[in-house]
Amino acid sequence: MENVTFVSNSHQRPAADNLQKLKSLLTNTRQQIKSQTQQVTIKNLYVSSFTLVCFRSGKLTISNNHDTIYCDEPGMLVLKKEQVVNVTLEEVNGHMDFDILEIPTQRLGALYALIPNEQQTKMAVPTEKAQKIFYTPDFPARREVFEHLKTAFSCTKDTSKGCSNCNNKSCIENEELIPYFLLFLLTAFLRLPESYEIILSSAQITLKERVYNIISSSPSRQWKLTDVADHIFMSTSTLKRKLAEEGTSFSDIYLSARMNQAAKLLRIGNHNVNAVALKCGYDSTSYFIQCFKKYFKTTPSTFIKMANH
């Protein structure tokens, strides 16, 4: 019988142990990176007003049916009103910082009036060819002017009588300067061929916008087509027909207004989901969450976590 020598593999264990430790280290590293970088995508966000987004940190991708803009450096996004966009927000090292400013229609009219007539004619581009999402790089004093306008729009009335919610004299004194502040913010944007047509079209109030504004003025109310028709002194049949001519319907606008209001309240961070549901006309919180998720493709809790940055 031949001698058989059994060789122990004990000398291979350190190598196996090191490999296991390496796998564990890589797993932990991936988990740490994942915990530091959170991402959420919000779909079907209706842009009801000419909107500026002050982007400070993180990563942001915004798109519609034709345009896609990717941001990973500080700057400002310009969004034409009455479009539907998808937004992806991503933290970088745990940080995501941005702010939103919706420009009232009448303010755009005042801004457009500052542009020389020959420049308006020269730079006008047909609506169907115009881009609807733009990015402009950061520049000195942009953030300060952005913050000033945000304060002014939240404090002042639509007229030039000054501030209605506080005693801040600067709100009253700077009322007439608001169009010039806007002009300063949009300097880079106004160099683009499409800019003047976009400002002009956004300064005009469509029937869709009128209906949207009526519903948004009281989102908790259970609106009906007849209610809105009475507000604008129009028959229900005429209202339906004219909205169809603009490519929309009362039910679509109603849902957009309620969901946008919900997103706005959740982004501010002063309301919990139950309160937001009630403020947007939903008696059932669970049904509201269901509608929110179906509309935006994300849950209210996930939206709050990212948007509150």
From Swiss-Prot:
Disruption phenotype: Decreases invasion of host cells.
Taxonomic superkingdom: Bacteria
Keywords: Activator, DNA-binding, Transcription, Transcription regulation
One GO molecular-function entry: DNA-binding transcription factor activity
Gene3D superfamilies: Homeodomain-like (1.10.10.60)
GO biological process entries: symbiont entry into host
PROSITE patterns: HTH_ARAC_FAMILY_1, HTH_ARAC_FAMILY_2
Pfam families xref list: HTH_18
Domain annotation HTH araC/xylS-type: ranges: 209-306
SMART domains xref list: HTH_ARAC
DNA-binding region(s) in UniProt: 226-247, 273-296
UniProt function note: Activates the expression of genes on pathogenicity island 1 (SPI1) that encode virulence proteins involved in invasion of host cells.
Protein name: Transcriptional regulator HilD
Organism of provenance: Salmonella typhimurium (strain LT2 / SGSC1412 / ATCC 700720)
Underlying gene: hilD
